[in-house]
C-alpha cells in the first residue's frame, strides 16, 4: 500500500551521514512508488526561534480558531499544508548533546502548534492531521545505545515520541537510532543505508 510520505530533514553538512540516509530513504520511497515530499529546514532558511509574534498567533487561534488570521511565519503555513497532505512522516536528524538540534526543535515548537497540528479540547490535545497514520524518526549519534538508554533515559523518546506525537494522538511512532556512526566502518554504514532503502521501498 502506497503512503504519501513527508520527510523532514536537518543537517548542516552536505556530506553528512544524515544526508546519505536522506538519499537512501528517498530512493526507497521512489522504488516503492510512494509519493513523497521533503522539507529541508536548512535549505528553506527556516527560522527556529519562537518570536513574540509567533506566540501571539496562539492567542489569535484561541479567539478565532483560525491560525491563518494571525501574523504567523509564512513557512509554518506552508509546512502546515504539507503535514495535512502526509500519511506518514519521516524525520531525519543527528543527536547533539543527547537531543535534537535547535533547528528541529524549533520546527516542533513552531509547527506542531495549536491550530496547525492539533486542537486543544480542554486538557486534551487532538490531532488536526487527520491523514497522518505513522511517524518514523531516524537519528544518528556517536553515543553507544546502552549509554543513551541507561544514563540518559533515551531522552529523545521522552520528548519527541511520547511528549509530542503520542500527546496529540499519534501512537504509531517508530524510532530508528543509528548509534556509534563515527566509530563504524564504511561497510557497516553501507549496510545501514541498504536496510533503510529496502524498508522504505516496501
Residue ranges and their predicted role:
Residues 84, 102, 130-133, 171:
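Structured loop/turn residues at beta-strand edges in well-structured enzyme cores
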Residues 9-11, 139-142, 177-180:
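Short, histidine-centered active-site or binding-site loop motifs used for metal coordination
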Residues 32, 147-202:
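Glycine-rich phosphate/pyrophosphate-binding loop and the adjoining helix
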Residues 7, 36-40, 137, 172-177:
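Conserved beta-strand scaffold positions in the cores of enzyme catalytic domains, especially
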Residues 119-166:
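Short, glycine-/small-residue-rich phosphate/pyrophosphate-handling segment
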Residues 1-116, 183-202:
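N-terminal beta1-alpha1-beta2 submodule of the flavodoxin-like/Rossmannoid cofactor-binding fold
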Residues 3, 34, 133, 170-171:
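A structural micro-motif
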Residues 114, 118, 170-173:
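Short, structured loop/turn "capping" segments at alpha-beta junctions
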Amino acid at each position: 500500500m502506497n503512503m504519501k510520505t513527508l520527510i523532514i530533514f536537518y543537517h548542516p553538512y552536505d556530506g553528512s551521514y544524515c544526508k546519505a540516509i536522506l538519499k537512501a530513504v528517498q530512493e526507497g520511497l521512489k522504488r516503492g512508488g510512494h509519493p513523497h515530499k521533503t522539507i529541508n529546514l536548512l535549505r528553506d532558511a527556516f527560522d527556529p526561534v519562537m518570536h513574540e509574534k509567533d506566540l501571539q498567533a496562539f492567542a489569535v487561534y484561541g479567539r478565532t480558531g483560525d491560525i491563518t488570521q494571525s501574523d504567523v511565519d509564512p513557512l509554518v503555513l506552508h509546512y502546515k499544508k504539507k503535514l495535512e497532505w502526509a500519511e506518514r512522516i519521516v524525520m531525519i536528524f543527528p543527536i547533539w548533546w543527547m537531543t535534537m538540534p535547535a533547528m528541529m526543535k524549533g520546527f516542533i515548537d513552531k509547527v506542531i502548534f495549536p491550530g496547525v497540528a492539533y486542537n486543544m479540547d480542554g486538557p486534551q490535545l487532538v490531532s488536526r492531521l487527520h491523514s497522518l497514520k505513522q511517524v518514523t524518526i531516524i537519528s544518528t549519534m556517536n553515543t553507544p545505545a546502552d549509554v543513551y538508554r541507561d544514563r540518559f533515559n533515551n531522552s529523545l523518546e521522552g520528548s519527541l515520541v511520547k511528549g509530542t506525537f503520542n500527546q496529540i494522538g499519534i501512537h504509531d511512532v517508530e524510532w530508528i537510532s543509528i548509534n556509534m556512526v563515527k566509530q563504524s566502518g564504511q561497510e557497516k554504514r553501507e549496510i545501514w543505508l541498504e536496510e533503510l532503502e529496502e524498508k522504505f521501498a516496501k
